[in-house]
Amino acid sequence: MPWLQVRLAISPEQAETYEDALLEVGAVSVTFMDAEDQPIFEPELNTTPLWTHTHLLALFEADTNAELALAHLSLLTGAELPEHSAEVIEDQDWERSWMDNFQPMCFGQRLWIVPSWHAAPQPDAVNLLLDPGLAFGTGTHPTTALCLEWLDGQDLKGCNVLDFGCGSGILAIAALLLGAEQAVGTDIDVQALEASRDNAGRNNIAAERFPLYLPEDLPPQQADVLVANILAGPLVSLAPQLTTLIKTGGRLALSGILAEQGEDVAAAYAESFDLDPIANRDGWVRITGRRR
């Protein structure tokens, strides 16, 4: 069915007031969107910052009188409404539309990431089946792609891999499918561990080959290969810990790093690793090396 969509241009300080007021006047959903393509990187813990210029989208049933709803909204907030618009939009099968847009992707020479509902384009390739139903890595972001391509180029036969900040489990599962003996995943988010476990099962990875832990429960064992696709700040602060988790001669791959942050992150690891040239893609970088 169609919906009435109301769009308001607000500041972060106005967000809570207008969200509550819109729900009060009958909105069935309220969504915040970036109005100017402003990225927010590394927010403080336990915060959900909004963009400097934010669009608030509210959906109402199609027979809602837009003028009356907006007038009521102005009364509730006690202020003149900010820049706004209202239009009727047709309903869509959002899930089907999203699924149609998520297509198989190739990384390197052997590895394909294939949506679980899609046939593998190359059945004889290394095909990782993924259900990106939660907001964790799918391969579409440059940092994930950089890590997957690096893994595809490594000889992982018999290796023990640690995926620090495993998210969907995409990197660890890729390593296992590419020949690793075992991969350990750790993440601060319990939902990420659940997503990793589900995706491992989808790829017929036995639980003993892919144990999953919260960071505080991670066993003190060293890996042959460590991958961490998180953020620059944590990568710098965790450098001493991550270094101890890699065997002498072991390999390291770090991403989640903006190009302008690359040198600072590399400097945090340079004392203990022989680092390769930094790989760059679309403003993001990957740092790799081998522990001395």
From Swiss-Prot:
Name the Gene Ontology biological process terms. Answer: methylation
Enumerate the residues binding S-adenosyl-L-methionine: 144, 165, 187, 229
E.C. number, please?
Answer: 2.1.1.-
Asked if Transferase is a keyword of the record, the answer is yes
User: Per the record, GO CC terms?
Assistant: cytosol
Where is this gene product found? Cytoplasm
Name a GO molecular-function annotation: protein-lysine N-methyltransferase activity
Q: Which UniProt keywords apply?
A: Cytoplasm, Methyltransferase, S-adenosyl-L-methionine, Transferase
At the top of the EC hierarchy, this enzyme's class is transferase
Reactions catalysed: L-lysyl-[protein] + 3 S-adenosyl-L-methionine = N(6),N(6),N(6)-trimethyl-L-lysyl-[protein] + 3 S-adenosyl-L-homocysteine + 3 H(+)
CDD domains per record:
AdoMet_MTases (cd02440)
Alphabetical list of NCBIfam families matching this protein: prmA
- Matching HAMAP family: Methyltr_PrmA (MF_00735)
Q: What does this protein do?
A: Methylates ribosomal protein L11.
Q: Which family does it belong to?
A: Belongs to the methyltransferase superfamily. PrmA family.
The entry's protein name is: Ribosomal protein L11 methyltransferase
Q: What is the lineage of its organism?
A: Bacteria, Pseudomonadati, Pseudomonadota, Gammaproteobacteria, Pseudomonadales
Designated gene of the protein? prmA
